[in-house]
């Protein structure tokens, strides 16, 4: 199986991988991280939120008032941290230092990440949503292509899996 760790802090990844390993023994398993290009350099919520246009903020506040939506009482999946190169590097370090067998990359498979994972003996996978993603993933050197269409649940791209695979 593959453990989706994109929304986990590095220390959580290390702890959870140790738990998984203790339960599966020597069986093979992997970790999936989303590695999109163009992320901000640092995990600065204040800087990112400052870039949100006032019109967007007013729109959300108006919806909350109109439908009586309370403020969140606990951090949610999308509010725990801001995706950044800083977090990505820490997550990758946690995965690469672990004894996990595979690294699956979503929304990009940076060649340097693929090379480092392979150097450490890990199988590399790329989750792709279109034919041009295949070309990029293969040029990055991944071992396995995982085709997933829009029907894969929360994955990007306009192509369904049954149409994507033959392409």
Predicted region positions:
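Active-site entrance/lid segments in N-terminal catalytic domains of soluble metabolic enzymes
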Residues: 1-167
